[in-house]
């Protein structure tokens, strides 16, 4: 401890590393790069300064006056500039410093030891600069236990002092904090959250002595979850009072403490900070935005949750009761998520979501309506706070007719909800409904950034399951398709990404047709023969998977095919679906039935005989009544696919240079970042953004017709209005599609469309683009290659894959889940 921190405290290079006496220095090499969010929480380039002290032996260079025996600081400076510029976002000063130090030690064998400091001045608005100091010694990785992250000149106002005049007015103090970054720790200390916690603590507390202040700040930092894992890490905290003695720039004290020392110490005011609830905000008592009366339509966002009985039915009933009110209109409903209970853990998992409503009610009147639905209509019994409940309806945000956030601070109602920023099960569904630029009215930060901050903590209880309801079956528990998405650290880039970590669903193709492109006539037989084939198919799939989706088709949808009549399609498919559902030889709790149809009447008949999923290759484009049928059955899953034209014209419509929605699009986002800030992505993503916009347009029509978001999966339509190269590009760009959103003008109002959390189905099986690459003219010869493509689809984020060769592709899926998701 003393070696490292004496180096840091006195001067960066005051203690020679590795016994070296010769050094080459580069002082404050200036460059601009993105270091994660800046002072204004924007991903903009920041100026950073790199200083290097490189221990070497230049005796030979000094004797010969020949540069080749020395470290060329001009070349090193150029190489460092090039190295830093190659990455779009380093994420933090610490990540940049760690990467630069490794780069220097790997590239320049003449560097025997290194002392590196990376400094940035605009990382946090409260601090003059944040820096990271890395020390390395070649051949002796254990020479130092810690690197250091330094927070300099952290400015705050607080009450401090023993004199009466000091107790009446807050005064400025600055803190210098040195955070140890253990060499064995993969991640650096969480600088942003530590600063926020320290600032909140100091500014909401008061002290008589600087000694109490510095000790308490050390305790606040020590109680951070990060340092609980490293109890022997030395924390250095220095405080200066800037106005105590006017003839000085400041007076104060400093201390070095280890978390284990502070754990048993009772620090005053520490109860005001608690890591589990992070930073709570106090709502202003003043209200600058007027609350309009009953004659004006306003907007509100309500969070709903249930964990008693039939949770989904309770949620449906609550939404129906809201919609029956003349003063309330349901505008948009989020996906449904399952979450582990917070606070009181010993209870059933919750089912959660958010709904956006238009209302003539005031906030207090809307609260009364919510309580009426909870306690009178659905008979909620509240035994204690945060306990089980049949239904919970909370007002999360309230906006006036101009779209301005309303702040309410009353004994029985706080808006925005004071604990919403602690809960992914509120923020995740809410962020499906609001634009990434929507600011929290109190913190003035984008709400989506608060969600990211929760996920970055990597707490298991913040991980959610997306649920897609399936119809109720007699004797079977309520059924759902389940998709688990988690934030994972990329061990190579150091960045966090949202990826699906639940098993991929296998959808087995069963074409009861004489003319499908690869298996026409194969299952075009009597019901008994078809059922035997289904039983074998299920056995093959369930050997490795918990469930299987059987996708029955009664009409070929291959491009340019002659379409069977509606009556013929019904004759081929409906009796078969009925037989499958009634079969006692099939494990009905593991068999999910789908019908591949674009006709609403066929879908309606299939629902009557037990189908769970409507797989519509047209996305409602071929039959205007399809959405009405889906809306009438809110427990039916609907796969909304992308195509253009019709069966006979789609192959001529694979040109995507111009955006179909044109000027109606106002703003586009990828991973919640405005596309205008992503110059390197704009030209490369024209195809997938076109597909995303056209899926979004059909999504809007579905929602306008009463379809619920929780019903919808999306399929970008491989092979439909796509060239072979475009099919490959779509597979590669699935991560963009799953994180694509946009705002657009629709019916004289602004609509936000968000594809986040939409499970994606891909159907590459035996398709022509595979044969184009493998030279397999016969579609049936493409099964082996299909297995490889299926694995790639999963690697790029597909949640469900549609295949012909169930037995072998089920193995490909299982392997891909193990490789890309770490599942066994």
From Swiss-Prot:
GO CC, any one term: mitochondrial envelope
Stretch list, region HPPK: 295-466
Amino-acid positions noted as binding (7,8-dihydropterin-6-yl)methyl diphosphate in the UniProt annotation, renumbered to this chain: 558, 596, 615, 715, 767, 802-804
PTM sites of type Phosphoserine: 286
Endoplasmic reticulum in keyword set: no
Sorted UniProt keywords: Acetylation, ATP-binding, Folate biosynthesis, Kinase, Lyase, Magnesium, Membrane, Metal-binding, Mitochondrion, Multifunctional enzyme, Nucleotide-binding, Phosphoprotein, Transferase
GO BP: folic acid biosynthetic process; tetrahydrofolate biosynthetic process
Primary residence: mitochondrion
Names of the cofactor(s): Mg(2+)
Highest taxon, organism lineage: Eukaryota
Region (DHNA 2): 147-284
EC number: 4.1.2.25, 2.7.6.3, 2.5.1.15
A Pfam family assignment: HPPK
Domain Pterin-binding: 504-814
Catalytic activity: 7,8-dihydroneopterin = 6-hydroxymethyl-7,8-dihydropterin + glycolaldehyde; 6-hydroxymethyl-7,8-dihydropterin + ATP = (7,8-dihydropterin-6-yl)methyl diphosphate + AMP + H(+); (7,8-dihydropterin-6-yl)methyl diphosphate + 4-aminobenzoate = 7,8-dihydropteroate + diphosphate
GO molecular function: 2-amino-4-hydroxy-6-hydroxymethyldihydropteridine diphosphokinase activity; ATP binding; dihydroneopterin aldolase activity; dihydropteroate synthase activity; kinase activity; metal ion binding
Region listing for DHPS, in residue ranges: 506-824
Function: Catalyzes three sequential steps of tetrahydrofolate biosynthesis.
Subunit-structure text: Homodimer. Interacts with NAP1.
Protein name: Folic acid synthesis protein FOL1
Taxonomic source organism: Saccharomyces cerevisiae (strain ATCC 204508 / S288c) (Baker's yeast)
Source taxonomy: Eukaryota, Fungi, Dikarya, Ascomycota, Saccharomycotina
């Amino acid at each position: 401890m003393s070696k490292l921190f004496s180096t840091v405290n006195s001067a960066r290079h005051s203690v020679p590393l590795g016994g070296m006496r010769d050094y080459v220095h580069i002082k404050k090499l200036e460059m601009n790069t993105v270091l994660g969010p800046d002072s204004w929480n924007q991903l903009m380039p920041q100026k950073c300064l790199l200083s290097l002290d490189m221990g070497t032996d230049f005796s030979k260079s000094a004797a010969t006056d020949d540069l080749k025996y020395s470290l060329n600081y001009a070349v090193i400076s150029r190489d460092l500039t090039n190295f830093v510029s190659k990455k779009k976002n380093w994420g933090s000063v610490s990540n940049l410093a760690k990467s630069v130090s490794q780069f220097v030690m790997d590239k320049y064998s003449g560097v025997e030891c290194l002392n590196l400091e990376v400094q940035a001045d605009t990382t946090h608005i409260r601090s003059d600069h944040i820096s990271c100091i890395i020390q390395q010694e070649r051949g002796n990785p254990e020479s130092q236990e810690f690197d250091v992250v330094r927070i300099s000149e952290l400015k705050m106002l607080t009450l401090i002092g023993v004199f009466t005049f000091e107790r009446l007015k807050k005064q400025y103090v600055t803190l210098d904090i040195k955070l140890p970054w253990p060499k064995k720790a993969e991640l650096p200390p969480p600088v942003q959250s530590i600063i926020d916690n320290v600032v909140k603590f100091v500014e909401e507390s008061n002290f008589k002595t600087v000694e109490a202040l510095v000790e308490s700040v050390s305790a606040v930092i020590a109680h951070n979850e990060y340092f609980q894992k490293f109890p022997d890490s030395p924390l250095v905290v220095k405080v200066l009072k800037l106005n105590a003695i006017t003839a000085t720039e400041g007076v104060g004290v400093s201390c070095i403490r280890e978390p284990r020392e502070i754990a048993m110490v009772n620090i005053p005011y520490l109860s005001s900070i608690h890591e589990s609830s992070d930073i709570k905000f106090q709502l202003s008592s003043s209200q600058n935005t007027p609350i309009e009366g009953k004659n004006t339509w306003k907007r509100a966002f309500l969070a709903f949750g249930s964990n008693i009985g039939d949770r989904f039915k309770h949620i449906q009933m609550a939404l129906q009761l809201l919609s029956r009110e003349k003063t309330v209109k349901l505008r948009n409903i989020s996906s449904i998520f399952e979450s582990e209970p917070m606070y009181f853990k010993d209870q059933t998992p919750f089912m959660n979501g958010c709904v956006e409503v238009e209302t003539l009610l005031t906030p207090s009147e809307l609260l009364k309506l919510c309580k009426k639905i909870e306690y009178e209509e659905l008979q909620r019994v509240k035994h204690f706070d945060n306990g089980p409940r049949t239904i919970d309806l909370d007002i999360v945000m309230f906006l006036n007719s101009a779209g301005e956030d309303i702040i309410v601070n009353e004994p029985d109602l706080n808006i925005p909800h004071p604990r919403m920023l602690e809960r992914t099960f509120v923020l995740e569904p809410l962020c499906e409904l609001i634009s990434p630029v929507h600011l929290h009215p109190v913190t003035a930060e984008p709400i989506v950034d608060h969600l990211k901050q929760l996920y970055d903590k990597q707490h298991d209880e913040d991980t959610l399951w997306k649920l897609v309801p399936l119809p109720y079956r007699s004797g079977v528990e309520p059924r759902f398709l389940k998709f688990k998405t988690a934030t994972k650290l990329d061990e190579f880039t150091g960045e966090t990404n949202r990826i699906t970590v639940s098993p991929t669903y296998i959808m087995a193709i069963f074409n009861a047709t004489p003319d499908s492109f690869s298996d026409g006539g194969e299952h075009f037989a009597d019901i008994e023969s078809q059922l035997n084939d289904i039983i074998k198919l299920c056995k093959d799939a369930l050997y490795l998977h918990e469930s299987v989706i059987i996708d029955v088709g009664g009409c070929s949808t291959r491009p340019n095919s002659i379409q069977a009549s509606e009556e013929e399609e019904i004759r081929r498919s409906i009796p078969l679906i009925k037989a499958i559902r009634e079969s006692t030889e099939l494990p009905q709790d593991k068999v999910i039935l789908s019908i591949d149809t674009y006709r609403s009447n066929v879908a309606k008949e299939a629902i009557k005989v037990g189908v769970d999923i409507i797989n519509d290759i047209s996305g409602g484009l071929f039959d205007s009544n399809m959405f009405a049928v889906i809306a009438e059955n809110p427990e039916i899953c609907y796969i909304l696919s992308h195509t253009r034209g019709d069966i006979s014209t789609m192959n001529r419509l694979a040109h995507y240079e111009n955006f179909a929605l044109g000027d109606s699009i106002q703003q586009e986002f990828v991973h919640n970042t405005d596309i205008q800030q992503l110059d390197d992505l704009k030209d490369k993503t024209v195809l997938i953004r076109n597909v995303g916009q056209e899926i979004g347009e059909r999504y809007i029509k579905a929602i306008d017709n009463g379809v619920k978001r929780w019903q919808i999966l999306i399929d970008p339509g491989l092979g439909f209005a796509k060239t072979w190269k475009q099919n490959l590009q779509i597979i590669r760009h699935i991560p963009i599609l799953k994180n694509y959103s946009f705002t657009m003008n629709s019916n004289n109002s602004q609509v936000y469309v968000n594809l986040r959390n939409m499970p994606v189905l891909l159907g590459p099986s035996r398709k022509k683009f595979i044969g184009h690459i493998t030279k397999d003219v016969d579609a049936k010869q493409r099964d082996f290659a299909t297995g490889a493509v299926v694995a790639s689809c999963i690697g790029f984020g597909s949640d469900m894959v549609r295949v012909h060769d169930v037995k072998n592709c089920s193995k490909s899926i299982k392997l891909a889940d193990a490789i890309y998701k770490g599942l066994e």
